[in-house]
Amino acid sequence: MQIGADGLLHHLYWGAGLTDVPSFLYDRAPYRRAHMVEGQPASSPMCSREYFHYECPTFGTGDFRIAALTATAENTGLDLCDLQFVAYRISEGREELRGLPFAVGEAVETLEVLTEDPLTKLKISLFFHLFEDVDVITRHMRIENGGDCAVRISEAMSATVDFENGCFSLMSLDGTTLREFTPCIQPLRPGVTEIGSTRGASSHQHNPNIALLRADTNEVQGEVFSFSMLYSGSYTLRMEQDAYGALRVQGGIQPRGFGWRLMPAETFDTPEIALCWSDGGCNGLSGKLHAFVRNHLLRGPWAHQVRPLLLNTWEACYFDVNEERLLKVGEAAARHGVELLVLDDGWFGCRNAANSSLGDWFCNSEK
């Protein structure tokens, strides 16, 4: 990333290691002609904000693509926010994300970048947590109301990543009951594409994980970029490809149905999102994410041990459960090393089919 001449935090690159950074920065110099309908700083009339890549783009500043933050001051109704760079800090370790799930680790490095809107005094801290052992970066945003009036937040993304070359296929995991996690691959087109949930839960309709695949990517080779929400509520993973083929990707809280009133001196943290890159195809990505979950998400004594085995009665019995049958299933399972038998559906009320007795939480003694 880089601090631009406009004072904003610019996104430069994410991917394989670079060997010649100066040449890369030279090639990134803006060249597109400014248009009269686009916002650009008076000092750089050839540099339109619509074409720059940003770490935290906001609404109403000349960047007409999807925004990472929309906040409205209650006293003026102003919903424009121009986040100027203030300071940054690099530290070892990380702080807890209160009330939300987050990744942990012994060798974590954290970059915190502070920006502020000069007019509303809204302060935005962008957090980048580097898990170098698995090539994963987790990100979230903290919003602090430094002004003297309440602010209404209606849009708050955990991360934004802009790609100069947005030629990708999108892989998502979709489905429903009994056919969850069905891979779906589709090419990205100009305009907005969204995977998300408005159910109050992440849901099995659309899993809160996506991957972007290059044209030559397969199971064992090619670039893959993944975005995984560490969040079980309503979410969005959305992309916008512009007329020049550049792509913006964002992940965060689902804006539909979301609104947060932030009083002066209060803070609001967005959920964490995990970003992972691999040049070893989908299999390489899976390996990195598997290691990330095992080493940095799982908690407690079983994180690195073989877990106890259990058998759930659903697939074996469905609703047809009774004492004699359960004993036979349990005895057979025990012979194979199973340590726990879980009685699933069919034990309560007149629960003999899926259309009866939900809520009748009393034991069916006849079974």
Give a label for each model feature:
Residues 7-241, 256:
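Polysaccharide-binding surfaces and accessory modules of carbohydrate-active proteins
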Residues 82-85, 260-279:
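Short Pro-Gly-centered flexible turn/kink motifs
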Residues 146, 273, 346:
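Flexible loop residues that form catalytic
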